[in-house]
Amino acid sequence: MHVKKGDRVVVLSGREKGREGVIKLSLPKKERVVVENVNIVKKHVKPMGNRQGGILEVEAALHVSKVMLICPACGKPSRTGHRVNDEGKKVRVCKQCNADVA
């Protein structure tokens, strides 16, 4: 996947289009990510044991194709590429400013 946990992203499409947030959880097998304060849905929870039931607001997962990384160097949404750095490690690279993405 082109984004990882902790990356700042912008939502490209849907009702949350244009919203920015940080990735809380990455689900590579399902190709989905959970972004903080984006795609809030209401979840109905039954009371179990000590926990009280009710309606909770939680962040639902978005498909990874609906988000784009915001480059930490240039601050713009951009696609990412890969290259091998001087130490022989594979790193992500911003396609706009050609800077390494941590």
UniProtKB/Swiss-Prot annotation:
<comment type="function">
    <text>One of two assembly initiator proteins, it binds directly to the 5'-end of the 23S rRNA, where it nucleates assembly of the 50S subunit.</text>
</comment>
<protein>
    <recommendedName>
        <fullName>Large ribosomal subunit protein uL24</fullName>
    </recommendedName>
</protein>
<keyword id="KW-0699">rRNA-binding</keyword>
<dbReference type="Pfam" id="PF00467">
    <property type="entry name" value="KOW"/>
</dbReference>
<dbReference type="Pfam" id="PF17136">
    <property type="entry name" value="ribosomal_L24"/>
</dbReference>
<dbReference type="InterPro" id="IPR005824">
    <property type="entry name" value="KOW"/>
</dbReference>
<dbReference type="GO" id="GO:0006412">
    <property type="term" value="P:translation"/>
</dbReference>
<dbReference type="GO" id="GO:0005840">
    <property type="term" value="C:ribosome"/>
</dbReference>
<dbReference type="InterPro" id="IPR003256">
    <property type="entry name" value="Ribosomal_uL24"/>
</dbReference>
<comment type="subunit">
    <text>Part of the 50S ribosomal subunit.</text>
</comment>
<dbReference type="GO" id="GO:1990904">
    <property type="term" value="C:ribonucleoprotein complex"/>
</dbReference>
<dbReference type="GO" id="GO:0003735">
    <property type="term" value="F:structural constituent of ribosome"/>
</dbReference>
<dbReference type="InterPro" id="IPR041988">
    <property type="entry name" value="Ribosomal_uL24_KOW"/>
</dbReference>
<comment type="function">
    <text>One of the proteins that surrounds the polypeptide exit tunnel on the outside of the subunit.</text>
</comment>
<keyword id="KW-0687">Ribonucleoprotein</keyword>
<comment type="similarity">
    <text>Belongs to the universal ribosomal protein uL24 family.</text>
</comment>
<dbReference type="InterPro" id="IPR005825">
    <property type="entry name" value="Ribosomal_uL24_CS"/>
</dbReference>
<keyword id="KW-0689">Ribosomal protein</keyword>
<dbReference type="InterPro" id="IPR014722">
    <property type="entry name" value="Rib_uL2_dom2"/>
</dbReference>
<dbReference type="GO" id="GO:0019843">
    <property type="term" value="F:rRNA binding"/>
</dbReference>
<keyword id="KW-0694">RNA-binding</keyword>
<dbReference type="InterPro" id="IPR008991">
    <property type="entry name" value="Translation_prot_SH3-like_sf"/>
</dbReference>
